[in-house]
């Protein structure tokens, strides 16, 4: 993300809100942002929970010249309905695009890893990536819950790893881990994130950092496919 604010005719920007805090005259809650969060579980239209701090909207850039700040949109989604092709054609086209997307993101001179939750999105990405780079160069990472088995989906992640023959590193996440790490999670998030998944992702990321520098995930699948 790109966060920015203007204080006493000075334009500040950073990739994290915490980097802007020392330059704020008064740290206050943005009530409109808070209303958005409580209603939609996120802030709308570039608002944040900090008064005076904004987030650059997607597909926009900022132009600053002679003290004037302008916002410009450089990309827009256009939907063109195609009734001339079959469902099979679109399925094949989508498969090709997904493979190309993963192929584009594994261009690295270090071994690749993948977050494997056991769900569809991360499983597809990790399966394709492991096939592209070779199972010896790929590794999966997942969390499991031995104490709360009703929430544990590590068996699905293991099934994927077995099918594609890549190693799967697992971390058993406990309530003690939550107690010891929740402050770090809050610090790195800057703003609250609806849902408990960010904590689990933090723990799995700590595990992955010991083995890989580049790790792919399945985030964004719901937004793209309407899941």
Regions of interest found by a model, annotated:
Residues 1-189, 201:
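Cysteine-centered catalytic environments shared across enzyme families
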């Amino acid at each position: 993300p790109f966060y920015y604010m203007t204080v006493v005719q000075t334009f500040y920007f950073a990739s994290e809100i915490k980097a802007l805090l020392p330059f704020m005259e008064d740290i206050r809650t943005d009530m409109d942002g808070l209303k958005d969060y409580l209603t939609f579980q996120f802030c709308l239209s570039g608002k944040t929970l900090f008064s005076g701090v904004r987030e650059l909207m997607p597909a926009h850039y900022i132009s600053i010249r002679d003290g004037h700040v302008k916002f410009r949109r450089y990309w827009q989604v256009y939907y063109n309905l195609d009734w001339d092709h079959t469902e099979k054609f679109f399925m094949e086209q989508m498969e090709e695009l997904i493979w190309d997307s993963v192929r584009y993101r594994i261009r690295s001179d270090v071994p690749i890893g993948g977050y494997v939750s056991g769900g569809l999105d991360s499983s597809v990405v990790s399966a394709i990536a492991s096939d592209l780079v070779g199972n010896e160069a790929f590794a999966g990472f997942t969390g499991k819950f031995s104490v709360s088995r009703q929430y544990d989906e590590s068996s699905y992640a293991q099934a994927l790893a077995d099918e594609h023959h890549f190693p799967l590193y697992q971390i058993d996440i406990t309530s003690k881990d939550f107690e010891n790490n929740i402050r770090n999670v809050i610090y790195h998030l800057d703003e609250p994130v609806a849902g408990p998944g960010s904590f689990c992702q933090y723990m799995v990321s700590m595990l992955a950092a010991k083995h890989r520098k580049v790790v792919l995930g399945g985030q964004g699948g719901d937004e793209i496919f309407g899941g």
